[in-house]
Amino acid sequence: MSHQIENAMTTAFLDFMDEWNALLGMTTPEHHRRIMKFLVDVWTSPPNRGLLMAFRHSGKSTVVGIFAACVLGLRPESRILILSAESTLSSRMVGHIRNILENHPRCADMIPTGRRTWSNDRITINPVSYTHLTLP
């Protein structure tokens, strides 16, 4: 992938995160921006593997949830597996992603009517992509 395309994708993900934080009345901390850049780099660069190490309560799960919602918007056919040591932690992450999808302005068309396909551990979205966010 060209450097120009990688930069455009990073910008798109950062914009999505900034919009989410603005909706919550917050600004995006610099370390969240670095985490998002890392996640985009892992997603776009083979071998698509990385290890994210950050201090407790640094917002790793917050950024990963925003990243997952953005991936679903860009590629609605994607399947994302969330693993954790305890099922309550993975269910909480799914709930975080669901909250973003339900409330981010760019995600309105992704919510299925009746939400029949949603549960504590699974989200199925409408196969549409964000109207204002596209891959370069």
Say what each PLM segment does.
Residues M1-N48:
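N-terminal accessory segments
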Residues W43, L72-G73:
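N-terminal cationic-hydrophobic initiation segments that often serve targeting/anchoring roles
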Residues L52:
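Hydrophobic anchor at the beta1->P-loop junction of P-loop NTPases
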Residues H57:
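Walker A (P-loop) phosphate-binding loop of P-loop NTPases
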Residues S61-A68:
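Motif I (Walker A/P-loop) of helicase-class P-loop NTPases
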Residues L74-A85:
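Conserved SF1/SF2 helicase motif Ia
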Residues L83-Y130:
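Conserved nucleotide-state-sensing and coupling region of NTP-binding domains
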Residues T131-P136:
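Conserved small/polar residues in nucleotide/adenosyl-binding loops
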